[in-house]
UniProtKB/Swiss-Prot annotation:
Modified residues (Phosphothreonine): T86
Family: Belongs to the major facilitator superfamily. Proton-dependent oligopeptide transporter (POT/PTR) (TC 2.A.17) family.
Lineage: Eukaryota, Viridiplantae, Streptophyta, Embryophyta, Tracheophyta
Protein name: Protein NRT1/ PTR FAMILY 5.4
Species this protein is from: Arabidopsis thaliana (Mouse-ear cress)
PANTHER family the UniProt entry points to: OLIGOPEPTIDE TRANSPORTER-RELATED (PTHR11654)
Record-level Gene Ontology MF annotations: dipeptide transmembrane transporter activity; tripeptide transmembrane transporter activity
Length: 555
């Protein structure tokens, strides 16, 4: 009776009907986030009086913290609360921070404005910690692995999920920035708060349609057990026929009997062989009941191997994420000093150029999903056309090339400023059309279509089934670390250039050398790309175990 009820629930719940509710929620939430982040440097420099470099570092630090909290949120989701409850709880925390924003520029006294504003930002960061890693995985959970149709739909889901995020950010950039700069910051922040309220209401409406995964205990404990068990048996021979396969029968029973979660057995691999010792049954294990800190199943060991394989990939993506931070910082200040007029009366706000990234992505993702993938699939026979790692690699190359272009455009802007005697006139517009910035914004969009979506898919698909919120948190955390690295690069460049008598990143960009800074980023990206290509070439993809399999892997 319970099995038939479970089957009916799986048929009536989940799928696109459920995922669409969560996608709409993400659109509203991302509208709020990008409505704040995309023009934050303007608020910090113009309203709070911070220098360009200080504002850039503050933004990078805030984004970095926002992207590190998800590790805690993912732990709570996978081990204690479950993804649904975590998303709901942290959405209210996020709303609290958002509500504090308009209060900081209206009710709060001017001398306290900066403190309250940054308090609001970091309360938002706490809320982001639970929302970010769980909402995407919760949406992806609505597509099962056992159903072939739903499994195929999941590949398209990641494309359209990112497309929804970009749609939200584009609307925010086009609408909110004009309100913030032309009407008032308090109205702009109030609209942001309203969008979060709408997101929570929509999320609650969709409750009857959701498939909810049950938390299975601390994933970190399972990882620690494998490490400890392998260390305890480091002297033993890891001969293949000594594996403790009897414990896999327990996992198979778990797979058949669990109604809410589906746990699949992993194929054994030859990588990280030292961990295989955790599965060996020695004399102590024969004579006593199983101690999970001495004896682990093959499946548990393979789960740890999945995580270890992703660590080098994670490291190789840090510089790409450091590059992304330029979009919300120096790109804006660069555009603010160029000719942005249309006709005689209309001037484009610098932050509005970020919508070009969104438009590029909104055009490319449907083309990628409906044209590129089917065409390439005929050649590669891969269900996604190209692998996640190949997709990421293309994006990394585009990002590296883009920073070279950024440096060239900035070098030309500086030359025009010198030719017109504007070196010491930072408030004067350099007579160079802001359309010169189009290539770098378009290339950011192209790079994101390949790398960001590829990262989301890789860190979801290659994580153990019970640790997918952790996988999303790991993906988000690399963005956070990239933001911290960007802050470190800015500080290092400031220190070194100042010691040589010519500071590269001063408030007056006509006296700065933003072009040199961009080329340093390009060089670091090139090194990172080479490291990534080496790691990706030796990466083993996850493969599920067939009944008669011994050791399987897919490169």
């Amino acid at each position: 009776m319970a099995d038939s009820t479970s089957l009916i629930n799986k048929r009536t719940k989940g799928g696109w009907n459920a995922a669409l509710f969560i996608i709409v929620v993400e659109i509203a939430e991302r509208f709020a986030f990008y409505g704040l982040a995309s023009n934050l440097i303007t608020f910090l420099t113009n309203e709070l009086g911070q220098s360009t470099a200080t504002a850039a570092k503050n933004i990078n630090t805030w984004i970095g913290v926002s992207c590190m909290f998800p590790i805690l949120g993912a732990f709570l989701a996978d081990s204690i609360l479950g993804r649904f409850k975590t998303v709901l709880l942290t959405s209210f925390i996020y709303l609290l921070g958002i509500v504090m924003l308009p209060l900081s520029v209206t009710v709060v006294a001017r001398r306290m404005r900066e403190k309250v504003f940054f308090m609001a930002l970091y309360v938002m960061a706490v809320g982001e910690g639970g929302h970010k890693p769980c909402v995407m995985t919760f949406a992806a959970d609505q597509f099962g692995e056992a159903n072939a149709e739903e499994k195929a739909a999941k590949t398209s889901f990641f494309n359209y999920w990112y497309m929804a995020i970009v749609l939200a950010s584009s609307i925010a950039v086009l609408a909110l920035i004009f309100i913030q700069e032309r009407v008032s910051w308090s109205l702009g922040f109030s609209i942001i708060a309203g969008s979060v309220v709408i997101a929570i209401v929509i999320f609650l409406i969709g409750i009857p349609k959701y498939r909810k995964q049950v938390p299975v205990g601390s994933p970190f404990t399972r990882v620690a057990q494998v490490m400890v068990a392998a260390l305890k048996k480091w002297r033993l021979s890891s001969t293949r026929h000594h594996y403790g396969l009897c414990y896999e029968e327990e996992d198979e029973h778990k797979l058949e009997s669990t109604n809410s979660n589906q746990v699949y057995l992993l194929a054994r691999t030859n990588q990280f062989r030292f961990l295989d010792k955790a599965t060996i049954i020695d004399e102590i294990d024969h004579n006593k009941n199983r101690n999970p800190w001495r004896l682990c199943t093959v499946n548990q060991v393979e789960e740890v191997k999945l995580i270890l394989r992703l660590i080098p990939i994670w490291i190789s993506l840090i510089m790409f994420c450091a590059t992304l931070t330029q979009l919300n910082t120096f790109f804006l200040k660069q555009g603010s000093m160029m000719d942005r007029t249309i006709g005689n009366h209309f001037t484009i706000p610098p932050a509005a150029f970020q919508s070009i990234v969104g438009v590029t992505i909104l055009i490319l993702i449907p083309l990628y999903d409906r044209v590129f993938v089917p065409m390439v699939r005929k050649i590669t026979n891969h269900h996604s056309g190209i692998t996640s790692l190949q997709r990421i690699g293309v994006g990394l190359f585009v990002a590296t090339f883009n920073m070279v272009i950024c440096g060239l455009v900035e070098a030309k802007r500086l030359k025009v400023a010198r030719d017109h005697g504007l070196i010491d006139s930072p408030k004067e517009v350099v007579p160079m059309s802001s359309l010169w910035l189009l290539p770098q914004y378009i290339l950011v969009g192209i790079g994101d279509v390949f790398t960001i979506v590829g990262m989301q898919e890789l860190f979801y698909d290659q994580m153990p089934e019970t640790m997918r919120s952790i996988g999303a948190a790991i993906f988000i955390s690399v963005v956070g670390v990239g933001s911290f690295v960007s802050t470190g690069i800015i500080s290092t460049v400031q220190t070194i250039s100042k010691s040589h008598g010519e500071e590269w990143l001063v408030n007056n960009l006509n006296r700065a050398h933003l072009d040199y800074y961009y080329w340093i980023i390009a060089s670091l990206n090139a090194v990172s790309l080479c490291f990534y290509l080496f790691i990706a070439n030796h990466f083993l993809y996850k493969k599920l175990q067939d009944k008669d399999d011994d050791v399987e892997s897919e490169r």
